[in-house]
Amino acid sequence: MFSFIMKAAILLILVGCISFCISSEPLNESEITFEREERSLADPAGRQKRQSGLSCPKRISHSPEYPRDCYDILQSCSGQSPPSGQYYIQPDGGNLIKVYCDMETDEGGWTVFQRRIDGTINFYRSWSYYQTGFGNLNTEFWLGNDNIHYLTSQGDYELRVELNNTLGNHYYAKYNKFRIGDSFSEYLLVLGAYSGTAGDSLAYHNTMRFSTYDNDNDVYSINCASHSSYGRGAWWYKSCLLSNLNGQYYDYSGAPSIYWSYLPGDNDQIPFAEMKLRNRSI
């Protein structure tokens, strides 16, 4: 009798895991939710159900049962790969937030924190917007410097940058270490070694603080974040740049825009850019 009960319990767990990993749909909401969700102490199970039916056994044990990043979600179903899409996570020390998880590229588990795809979202924004995040997870967004800081402070993280040029050719840049500091450090950038096909246009900005048009932290005589010659947009400027993926969107006019200096082809007319991070445990 005991053996039968154990087998039935295992079967229920496997069915729940397969249901999440194969058939669940990404969350329906289109706008990023950066504000903290109120926790229901009386119904923690109900909160868990809101995470797209997540019922797989978890390797994480911290309260309140939300994964810390997309890598945690990937690891929650042994032998099965959850779909790419929107999920709730809660980084250590941070708020409950909704993110887009890339579960396909380079073995999956990537938490996407920036995307440029169609110019529908204005990226020429103030410090406070970049601090908390803005945009639409279905199109273009910045996840927020506070959120990126909390994510990259949880352990050893890597960065992957995806880029398309005007010919439609795809390139990537990967850094084996990625972290940004807190608001007191003005989100100082820390990078490791480069690999990839896009060229290393970010190492120049290593150890630089984040700048916006209303908070100039570069080492140049002008504010690089507000100057039209550099595409405008917030970034870890130095004096001034070899890259800026938050510049004004590519519009065929030839004006400075999203920029990656060593990208083959049109390095300052980039129609697609995406930045994502992942725990290096993979």
From Swiss-Prot:
Disulfide linkage: 70-101, 224-240
Span of domain Fibrinogen C-terminal: 61-281
Stretches that traverse the bilayer: none
Gene3D superfamilies: Gamma Fibrinogen, chain A, domain 1
A Pfam family matched in the record: Fibrinogen_C
InterPro entries with a match to the protein in the record: Fibrinogen-like_C, Fibrinogen_a/b/g_C_1, Fibrinogen_a/b/g_C_dom, Fibrinogen_C-term_domain, Fibrinogen_CS
Annotated Gene Ontology cellular component terms: extracellular space
Keyword match Disulfide bond: yes
The keyword Repressor is assigned to this record: no
Keyword terms of this UniProt record: Disulfide bond, Signal
Signal peptide: 1-24
Annotated protein name in UniProt: Fibrinogen-like protein A
Species per Swiss-Prot/TrEMBL record: Apostichopus parvimensis
